Amino acid sequence: KTRAELKYDAKALFKGRWKDAILLNLIPTILSIVVTLLIAAVVISLSDNADTTLRNWLDNVMFSDEGTGNGTSNVGSGILSTLFTVGISFTFLDWFRNPKMEINPLKNGLQVFTKKYFLRVLLIYILTSIFTTLWSLLLIIPGIIKSYAYSQAYLIYKDQSSSISNENISSLDCITESKNLMKGHKWRLFILDLSFLGWDILAVLSLGIGFIWLMPYKNATKVAFYQDLINNN
């Protein structure tokens, strides 16, 4: 399918049910708004007329690695953000396949934190992070390419966990399958991501409020991309 068709599928899914989609994405949306506001605060604080004390405090909070465990905090926030997003993607995948399904925003959005998914999803995150970092040591471009190659591993795991015993699912196999599935499609997904850039900028300019609608739209479109991949393989 074309980018326009994938985006249409996402919007069609939400027709009459935008409230469900927004509530499902509430936690990562709030995080995005907070980050946007913090960035805005930093920009303001660095202006010539900003208060020096505020500027120094924001510099320490946002950029300092000393004493506060900022590096560890960044890793932790990255893991949490991924877990929330994956749980939402799992729900969208079920929703695409059963458009009339009832959405429980809290239960569905946090499903990755259950025994069925948590450890395997976390392991996929750790492995893909390690692999991407190692490739990035060569040059940044190989790291970006590999991140796209690994991008479908979570949804592949979701499908496999529904068909066979959890104990038999290998996180590494899901990553390998993602690489195979993405052969010839990495650039396509990159362009799909790029097509949202204008909306991302508008969302930031609205101090993050636009993410309330944009986050569900982007997440659902990426799930539609995965569904299209497996339909054609």
Located regions from the model:
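Hydrophobic alpha-helical membrane segments
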Residues: 1-233
